[in-house]
């Protein structure tokens, strides 16, 4: 089963993503901080990460840079409520950028595309 790591400091977002993505057949692990995500990367590596940009403590961009230093092969989807970041995601070495929405269809499609692109589907 494909394992996804969702990193978001908002509990309701983590719960929504966990519920909806589990329904899609994924094994979903959620954490609330970049630091927790980096720990999971070492102890229970995912197949893909959905990473919020604005996090308490270390932000999502610094977390992404650390992830890329360790696991360049790991697909990462940046996820934020702010569409203004969309133009910058490629320069940050993320695979995709999805604006947060109650409708998760774009996120679900992007997850499939990123996994297929990286040969992990």
Please state what every model-predicted region is:
Residues 14, 56:
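The feature encodes the CheY-like receiver
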Residues 15-23:
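Charged docking surfaces used in two-component/phosphorelay signaling
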Residues 25-32, 40:
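Short hydrophobic/Thr-rich beta-strand motif most characteristic of the beta2 strand and flanking loop
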Residues 33, 59-62:
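Acidic catalytic/metal-coordinating carboxylates
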Residues 39, 61-72:
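Short amphipathic alpha-helix used as the core "switch/output" element in two-component signaling
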Residues 52:
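Active-site residues of response regulator receiver
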Residues 102-115, 119:
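C-terminal output helix
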């Amino acid at each position: 089963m494909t394992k996804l790591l969702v990193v978001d400091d908002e509990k309701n977002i983590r719960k929504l993503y966990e519920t909806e993505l589990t329904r899609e057949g994924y094994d979903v692990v959620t954490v609330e901080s970049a630091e927790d995500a980096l720990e999971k990367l070492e102890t229970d590596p995912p197949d893909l990460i959905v990473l919020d940009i604005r996090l308490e403590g270390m932000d999502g961009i610094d977390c992404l840079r650390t992830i890329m230093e360790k696991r360049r092969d790991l697909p990462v989807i940046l996820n934020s409520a702010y569409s203004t970041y969309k133009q910058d995601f490629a320069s940050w070495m993320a695979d995709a950028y999805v604006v947060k929405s109650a409708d998760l269809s774009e996120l679900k499609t992007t997850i499939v595309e990123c996994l297929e692109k990286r040969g992990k589907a």
